Swiss-Prot record:
Superkingdom of source: Eukaryota
Chain residue ranges for the region called Disordered: 92-111
SUPFAM superfamilies according to UniProt: Oxygen-evolving enhancer protein 3
Gene Ontology molecular-function annotations: calcium ion binding; electron transporter, transferring electrons within the cyclic electron transport pathway of photosynthesis activity
Protein name as annotated: Oxygen-evolving enhancer protein 3, chloroplastic
Family matches, as Gene3D superfamilies: Oxygen-evolving enhancer protein 3 (PsbQ), four-helix up-down bundle
Upper classification of the organism: Eukaryota, Viridiplantae, Streptophyta, Embryophyta, Tracheophyta
Entry's Gene Ontology cellular component terms: chloroplast; chloroplast thylakoid membrane; extrinsic component of membrane; photosystem II oxygen evolving complex
Record keywords, A-Z: Chloroplast, Membrane, Photosynthesis, Photosystem II, Plastid, Thylakoid, Transit peptide
Intracellular or extracellular location(s): Plastid, Chloroplast thylakoid membrane
Similarity comment: Belongs to the PsbQ family.
Length: 232
């Protein structure tokens, strides 16, 4: 009996020791599991941060290299352009208003000291003697419009005729005003006759009629000669 009790006690002690051992093993597993996971998570986070920082550094480095390359390329382009620069050759001044007939009025000198009235932008008055000389020049220019009639260049004929007639009318008015009273009337009649034929010639150019242009050009030439004879 005593022997049986001793064997039962031995079995109980052995089973208790086995149970305690299993508890210790399982307890160590529970403790080691979370400890291992807590250590692993920070390591993974550190790895991710390191990778992000390295990627940003790589992007910045590439951007800087691209900027430097663009700067070098633009600098070389500017140097090439400057190397190929050629001096600009400045020639003589162009003809009056491009040399087109009927546009010389824009090249006439104006008195910039005058106030902003019509006198500043219209033909400036000349003394009677100088006005007579300019009237002769305008009359000779009117005689040269025959070339436009021959070429049937009607716009050029009108432009040149009107320009010269404006000078001639202005200067003849100055000359007539300085003449004695007995000479004014005859010169005014000749002037009126002259500008009547000029107006008819302008109308012939407007309707593009070679026949009428020839007719009124002949009358204009005759009237100009009479006026110039009076001017002396």
């Amino acid at each position: 009996m005593a022997q049986a009790m001793a064997s039962m006690a031995g079995l109980r002690g052995a089973s208790q020791a086995v149970l305690e051992g299993s508890l210790q093993i399982s307890g160590s597993n529970r403790l080691s599991g979370p400890t291992t996971s807590r250590v692993a998570v920070p390591k993974m986070g550190l790895n991710i941060r390191a990778q992000q920082v390295s990627a940003e550094a790589e992007t910045s480095r590439r951007a800087m290299l691209g900027f430097v390359a663009a700067g070098l390329a633009s600098g070389s382009f500017v140097k090439a352009v400057l190397a190929e620069a050629r001096p600009i050759v400045v020639g003589p001044p162009p003809p009056l208003s491009g040399g087109l007939p009927g546009t010389e009025n824009s090249d006439q000198a104006r008195d910039g000291t005058l106030p902003y009235t019509k006198d500043r932008f219209y033909l400036q008055p000349l003394p009677p003697t100088e006005a007579a000389q300019r009237a002769k020049v305008s009359a000779s220019e009117i005689l040269n419009v025959k070339q436009f009639i021959d070429r049937k260049a009607w716009p050029s004929l009108q432009n040149d005729l009107r320009l010269r007639a404006s000078y001639l009318r202005y200067d003849l008015k100055t000359v007539i005003s300085a003449k004695p009273k007995d000479e004014k009337k005859s010169l005014q009649e000749l002037t009126s006759k002259l500008f009547s034929s000029i107006d008819n010639l302008d109308h012939a150019a407007k309707i593009k009629s070679p026949t009428e242009a020839e007719k009124y050009y002949g009358q204009t030439v005759s009237n100009i000669n009479e006026v110039l004879a009076k001017l002396g």
